């Protein structure tokens, strides 16, 4: 995390350029003004990339949106929750397994049932690991408390690359630059060994303002051993 270093670096910058200015260096003020202007513009766009759509009348492609990682998670939880409801109709309780600590935490936060149970009986778990990969390694495992239950294994797929002519298509408002779903992947071996059956329910799009922002691949896992 670079955040703690930002303020000290600003102080170092001021000390350096103040000394140069006092020594008679030229163009310090013009360069400072240019830097502040460019920085203000970039920060404004980076903190609200929807402005690109308002300025150009074209939404920024999701693959290029730096805010993609912080958007669409409530909708992702809704998509996962809908699949959970379908599996729960089979009559067994359903818990969730995330392939990454990020998606595990996001589902815990945005699914009301998971958020309500997080302190006493967690509903969302991180996939098992032999060594500590994150804080979830130290939490109780679902293998201890959810035997004979069903589960959803959720992982986010990487968005495919934009085609080489995406800029021209984007400029002409041709939706052909919109990316197709990534190919399905097989379930991990450890997951197959833990359940009686593991079924890939498909690649589920997560929309934000009408554009696919994420794809999540969801596996229906039945009867934990």
Task: Show which residues each predicted segment covers.
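Hydrophobic/aromatic-rich transmembrane helices and adjacent perimembrane loops
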Residues: 1-24, 31
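Weak global preference for isoleucine
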Residues: 2, 15, 42-45, 55, ...
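A short small-residue
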Residues: 57-61
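Generic hydrophobic alpha-helical segments
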Residues: 11-12, 51, 87, 114
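Luminal/periplasmic acceptor-recognition loop/helix of membrane-associated glycosyltransferases
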Residues: 62-225
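Signature aromatic-anchored transmembrane alpha helix within multi-pass, membrane-resident enzymes
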Residues: 18-56
């Amino acid at each position: 995390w670079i955040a703690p270093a930002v303020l000290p670096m600003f102080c170092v910058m001021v000390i350096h350029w103040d000394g140069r200015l006092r020594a008679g260096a030229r163009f310090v003020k013009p360069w400072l003004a240019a830097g502040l202007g460019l920085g203000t513009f970039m920060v404004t766009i980076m903190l609200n990339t929807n402005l690109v759509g308002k300025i150009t009348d074209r939404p920024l492609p999701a693959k290029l949106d730096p805010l993609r990682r912080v958007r669409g998670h409530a909708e992702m939880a809704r998509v996962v929750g809908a699949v959970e409801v379908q599996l729960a109709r089979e009559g067994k309780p359903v818990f969730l397994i995330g392939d990454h600590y990020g998606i595990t935490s996001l589902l815990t936060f945005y699914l009301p049932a998971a958020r309500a149970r997080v302190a006493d009986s967690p509903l969302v778990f991180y996939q098992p690991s032999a060594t500590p990969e994150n804080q979830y390694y130290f939490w109780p495992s679902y293998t201890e408390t959810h035997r004979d239950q069903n589960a959803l294994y959720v992982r986010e797929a990487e968005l495919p690359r934009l085609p080489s002519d995406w800029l021209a298509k984007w400029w002409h408002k041709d939706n052909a630059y919109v990316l197709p779903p990534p190919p399905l992947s097989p379930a991990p071996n450890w997951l197959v060994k833990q359940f009686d059956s593991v079924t890939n329910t498909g690649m589920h799009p997560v929309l934000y303002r009408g554009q696919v922002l994420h794809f999540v691949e969801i596996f229906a896992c039945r009867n934990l051993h």
